[in-house]
Every structure is written in C-alpha cells, then in structure tokens.
C-alpha cells in the first residue's frame, strides 16, 4: 500500500486531476441481468420494498435481446403471474399481446405498431415503457412473488419479481381470487409455468366484445326546433301510394316488343322543350346578347371619328395639301430645264 501511495504522489498534478474527473464522470452501471433463452431482463433489483408513503408499487427494468441478433419484425406476448405458495397455484393478473414490432437496438417490444391488453387486474406491466410491475395504492395482500412470462420467437422465459408491502399505515384492500382462477402447479414451478395451457391462450384469441351503437334520432327540419312526430304504418303506405299514382309510367310494351310512350310523358317533354325555346327567345335574353354588341360597335365608331378629326386638323393648320406641294415641284419626264435669264446664276444640277 505504501508503494502504491508513493507512486500516486509522484504523478503530475494535471494527470491526477484528469483521472479523478474521468472517474467522477464515468456512469456507474448497477443492477442485475437475468439471461433467458429468447430475451433477457435488466433490473435494478428483482425485489422491492414499498415505503409507507409510496402511492404506487413499481419495478422498472428493460427487456433485451442478447442471445444472437435481434429480429427485425416479430410479435410476442407478455403475462404477469402471481404465485400462491400456500395453495401451490398461480393467478394470471395481466396479459398483453404485441404485434408488428421493429428492431430498436437490442430492446424488446419497443415501437410496436399494435398492442392489445385482453386481461388487466390490480397488477399490470408496460414493458415498452420499461415497467415490469405496477400496482396502484398497494396493500399488504399485494405483496408476494410475481413471474413475468415472456413469449417471443417460439421461446418462453420466466423472470421472478418480489414485492414487499409493510402493513403499517396502509388500508387493507383484499385481493379477490377464487379457487377456480388459481391454476394448480404440477411438478416444479419452473416447468409448470413454462408450459402454457391452451385454455390460457383463449384470452388472446377471443375477440373483444362489440359495444352497441347508441340509437340515432332523425334530425328536426331546419328552421324549427320541434322534433318530427312519428307516423303510423298506414300513413306511410298512403304516402307511398300517392307518390306512385303521381309518377307517370314512361310507356308500355306492345305485342311486338316495341315501347309505346305514354301520352302524358310525351306532352310533358314537348312542353318542356317549348318553354326552353321560349325562354331563350325572350326579350331579356335578346337584351343580354345585343347589349355588349352595341357597346363594342359604338366604341369602334368613336375611334373612327376621332381619327378623321385628327386628319382634318392637320390639313387646316398647313393651309394646303402637303401632297400637292410635292407634286408641283416635280418636273415631267422629257421636259427641258428653264433657260436662265441674264444676270441670274444657272441652277446647279442636283
């Protein structure tokens, strides 16, 4: 010990401080790891003592895939069994079924798309939230040993959890469990709990009861707050007969199989066509068509008149036609240039 202390004192102060800081920042790994054939469980402790002021009994832990690679898509079932050593039987307190579970690192039942809980009593579990055992307002009868049975990939694993609940300061809530619900143990506890009775799996295959839909009442007509009165069967039959009588038959088939139209139907069709034609030729429709046409025509005539006025103003300002001045300066073809008079310079040819 003296040699070790002497060697430590010889280390540089900076290196010693760095080693102490690294040791302080290193997370302390604690807990117990129980290995199984399909999954393993890591818990801080398989037994828990519930304090007198604790409102809930909770044992947290994580289910892990440690034996081989974790499956990419799997399903499984998780059950919570309560042991009764005095009567050598067990009671199933909780059952859950997980389906369509993806691979999330090495944790089991994380991110499953479907979960169903066909059975839930006082004790429950939520392994996807890292909760292996949960009891709300625990009482002394809730103390004892529980077994978490996990079935996945054709394997069954058992993990024992123990809860201790002191009686002082707690109300007594008796846990009802009849002798029929407590299944007897044949042989050892391990072998009996590992073999699943087909009757126990019936809870997973039985569909949940369908809740009856609430009766619907017809909505009252808009604008009134009164509820429509129920009508008798005779009134409904009379209304149906009146509707049938008012609806004309389109036609009948003759002996040759040709459709003969009913006169009332033909007259109604002709009357509808006449009304449509008359409506199209009414004064309102004609005004709607001719109105925009007249407006466009007036705009066009106004533009033509404006252009004519501009041309007239240009001619009046010059006093003569510009085209006539250009025409007068031109010399006809074949004409001789004018003879210059004495004393005037002759025009130079252009």
From Swiss-Prot:
Residues 232-241 have a biased composition (Acidic residues). Glycans are attached at residues 56, 73, 153, 256, 262, 275. One of its GO terms (cellular component) is viral envelope. It is a single-pass membrane protein; Single-pass type I membrane protein. Residues 202-253, 316-350 are annotated as: Disordered. It comes from the Viruses. Residues 32-285 are virion surface. Residues 309-350 are intravirion. Keywords: Glycoprotein, Host cell junction, Host cell membrane, Host Golgi apparatus, Host membrane, Membrane, Phosphoprotein, Signal, Transmembrane, Transmembrane helix, Viral envelope protein, Virion. Residues 1-31 form the signal peptide. The chain crosses the membrane at residues 286-308. Its main location: virion. InterPro entries: Herpes_gI. Residues 206-221, 335-350 have a biased composition (Pro residues). It is found in: Virion membrane; Host cell membrane; Host cell junction; Host Golgi apparatus membrane. Interacts with gE. In epithelial cells, the heterodimer gE/gI is required for the cell-to-cell spread of the virus, by sorting nascent virions to cell junctions. Once the virus reaches the cell junctions, virus particles can spread to adjacent cells extremely rapidly through interactions with cellular receptors that accumulate at these junctions. Implicated in basolateral spread in polarized cells. In neuronal cells, gE/gI is essential for the anterograde spread of the infection throughout the host nervous system. Belongs to the alphaherpesvirinae glycoprotein I family. This is Envelope glycoprotein I.
């Amino acid at each position: 010990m003296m040699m070790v202390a002497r060697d430590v004192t010889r280390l540089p102060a900076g290196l010693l401080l760095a080693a102490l800081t690294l040791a302080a920042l290193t997370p302390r790994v604690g807990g117990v790891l129980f290995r199984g054939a399909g999954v393993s469980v890591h818990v801080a402790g398989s037994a828990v003592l519930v304090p007198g002021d604790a409102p809930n009994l909770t044992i947290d832990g994580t289910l892990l895939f440690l034996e081989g690679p974790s499956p990419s898509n799997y399903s499984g079932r998780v059950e919570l069994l309560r042991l009764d050593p005095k009567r050598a039987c067990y009671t199933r307190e909780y059952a859950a079924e997980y389906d369509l579970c993806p691979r999330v690192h090495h944790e089991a039942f994380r991110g499953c798309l479907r979960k169903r809980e066909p059975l839930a009593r006082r004790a429950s579990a939520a392994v996807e939230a890292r909760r292996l055992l949960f009891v709300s307002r625990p009482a002394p009868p809730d103390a004892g040993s529980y077994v978490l049975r996990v079935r996945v990939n054709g394997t069954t694993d058992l993990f024992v959890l123990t809860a201790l609940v002191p009686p002082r300061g707690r109300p007594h809530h008796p846990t009802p469990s009849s002798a029929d619900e407590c299944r007897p143990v044949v042989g050892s506890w391990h072998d009996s709990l590992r073999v699943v009775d087909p009757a126990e799996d019936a809870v997973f295959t039985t569909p949940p009861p369908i809740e009856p839909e609430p009766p619907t009442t017809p909505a009252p007509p808009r604008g009134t707050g009164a509820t429509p009165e129920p009508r008798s069967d005779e009134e409904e039959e009379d209304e149906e007969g009146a509707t049938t009588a008012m609806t004309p038959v389109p036609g009948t088939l003759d002996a040759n199989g040709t459709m003969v139209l009913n006169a009332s139907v033909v007259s109604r069709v002709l009357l509808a066509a006449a009304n449509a034609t008359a409506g199209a030729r009414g004064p309102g429709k004609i005004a709607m068509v001719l109105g925009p046409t007249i407006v466009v025509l007036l705009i066009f005539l106004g533009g033509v008149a404006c252009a004519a006025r501009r041309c007239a103003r240009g001619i009046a300002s010059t006093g003569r036609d510009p085209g006539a001045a250009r025409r007068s300066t031109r010399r006809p073809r074949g004409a001789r240039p004018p003879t210059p008079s004495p004393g005037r310079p002759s025009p130079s040819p252009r």
